[in-house]
């Protein structure tokens, strides 16, 4: 027995409704040509005009000229690479540092297999995954802060 009821096309009332076009979205403005020919180009040209206006009225300054003879004491990467930089800086063997970095995606791929019995999508009802992600976030923040400090204070964050 089917759960869903199939429409009876031999019903004259249903056939009359379908003949009038009811049940289809024929209301409102059509997308072609109103949106695609008129509204989209106006939005695109308006956005481009705003960008050009901002570039002319408030140009970005490039800063000081580079001096190749005055290098900083320690060159830092961009902020999003601080944890990776800290791992490579602290671990004595560089190959071990690269292996440690490959463990991160491998650990993320293992989470569904570790917690495969949990059917919930709510993160608060998935304690293993939540603990794993919170631990990873704390380690990433710790490594990122340590990368900003000198090498002798980077592991203790200058607290000890």
From Swiss-Prot:
Keywords: Electron transport, Membrane, Photosynthesis, Thylakoid, Transmembrane, Transmembrane helix, Transport. GO terms for biological process: photosynthetic electron transport chain. PROSITE patterns: CYTB_CTER. Gene3D superfamilies: plastocyanin oxidoreductase, Single helix bin. The keyword Electron transport applies. The keyword Transport applies. PANTHER family: CYTOCHROME B, CYTOCHROME B_B6 C-TERMINAL REGION PROFILE DOMAIN-CONTAINING PROTEIN. HAMAP family: Cytb6_f_subIV. This is Cytochrome b6-f complex subunit 4. It comes from Prochlorococcus marinus (strain MIT 9303).
């Amino acid at each position: 027995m089917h759960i869903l009821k199939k429409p009876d096309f031999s019903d004259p009332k249903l056939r009359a409704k379908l003949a009038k076009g009811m049940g289809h979205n024929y209301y409102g403005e059509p997308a072609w040509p109103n949106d695609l020919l008129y509204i989209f180009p106006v939005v695109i040209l308006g956005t481009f005009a705003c960008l050009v206006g901002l570039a002319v009225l408030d140009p970005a300054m490039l800063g000081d000229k580079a001096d190749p003879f005055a290098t900083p004491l320690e060159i830092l990467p961009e902020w999003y690479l601080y944890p990776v930089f800290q791992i490579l800086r602290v671990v004595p063997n560089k190959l071990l540092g690269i292996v440690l970095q490959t463990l991160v995606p491998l650990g993320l791929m293992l989470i569904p297999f570790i917690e495969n019995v949990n059917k919930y999508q709510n993160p608060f009802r998935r304690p293993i995954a939540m603990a794993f992600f919170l631990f990873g976030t704390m380690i990433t923040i710790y490594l990122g802060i340590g990368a900003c400090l000198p090498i002798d204070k980077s592991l203790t964050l200058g607290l000890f």
